[in-house]
Design a protein with these regions (language model features):
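Long, charged amphipathic helices and adjacent flexible linkers at domain junctions
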Residues: 1-39, 162
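Electropositive phosphate-/nucleotide-binding environments in soluble metabolic enzymes
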Residues: 28-36, 57, 79, 103-111
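Phosphate-interacting basic helix/loop segments used at nucleotide- and nucleic-acid interfaces
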Residues: 33-47, 109-124, 128
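Acidic/histidine-rich
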Residues: 46-67
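Structural motif
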Residues: 48-51, 70-73, 92-94, 128-131, ...
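Nucleotide-binding motor/catalytic cores of P-loop/tubulin-like NTPases across gene-expression machines
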Residues: 59-61, 67-107
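C-terminal binding/interaction regions
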Residues: 115-138, 144-156
Length: 162
């Protein structure tokens, strides 16, 4: 019953406009700009998911507040934060095993994001696009400062026709 109500409300063509009418003044930080850009980029390129690398969860929570049209995969090395993020709208948390993410290898992080999105079923086709957000230095709360578009097949398989 609740799912039907949610689907009907969120399916209304004026839903996004209605939500935005209640938004307070925009946060002027770089992290806020990255989140807004990720949502718009996802819509523009038809991305199937937004992947957010996060330690404290603030980036994924900010993205959730903006209600993007696609699911948010929050990858965190902190299990407690991942559990908390499970309560955020549209967020699918994943706990990265210790050592599975080399924060000095951004291409490796992008590959990990693609593999995880495929494994979680958020994308199904290798040509599906994913928008990835991260903050460097990694682990700094609220430091989202990178947004990247990558095909689900990985960062080394970019095809200009995509």
């Amino acid at each position: 019953m609740q799912q039907r109500i949610i689907n009907r409300v969120e399916g209304d063509p004026h839903y996004q406009q209605y939500l935005q009418s209640f938004e307070p003044e925009h946060d002027q930080s770089a992290a806020a700009a990255i989140i807004l850009a990720a949502r718009q980029i996802a819509r523009t390129v038809g991305a199937k998911a937004i992947v957010s690398f996060t330690v404290g969860g603030s980036t994924a929570q900010r993205a959730s507040k903006k209600r993007p049209d696609v699911p948010i995969l929050a990858i965190s090395p902190v299990e407690e934060k991942a559990r908390q993020l499970a309560l955020s709208w549209g967020v699918y948390p994943d706990v990265a095993a210790p050592g599975s993410i080399d924060t000095d290898d951004f291409r490796g992080m992008l590959s990990f994001a693609c593999e995880t999105a495929l494994a979680k079923g958020l994308v199904s086709d290798p040509n599906d696009m994913i928008v990835v957000t991260a903050g460097f230095p990694f682990g700094t709360p609220g430091a989202a400062n990178i947004v990247r578009v990558v095909p689900a097949s990985g960062p080394t398989t970019w095809d200009a026709s995509l």
